């Protein structure tokens, strides 16, 4: 899980730097941001699922030590859909890619 989180964080930092320095035009940066969102939400879903697996039954209870995992696992799909579904974002990224 740490590898996935660190790779997502590094990608976000790289895109923020490119935006701040004006290194990329808005179209290519938009496509890269769309790909990064898909990557981040897939990693979020994976980490929520694995954390739920680690905690077992406690991750399904809204109280106690598993309450945070329960909430994240319940809301993971909402965060993936908000701002554009993965399919729409992937299509946009491909259309805006510089090939």
Task: Tell me the role of every PLM-derived stretch.
Residues 1-99:
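Alpha-helical interface subdomain recognition
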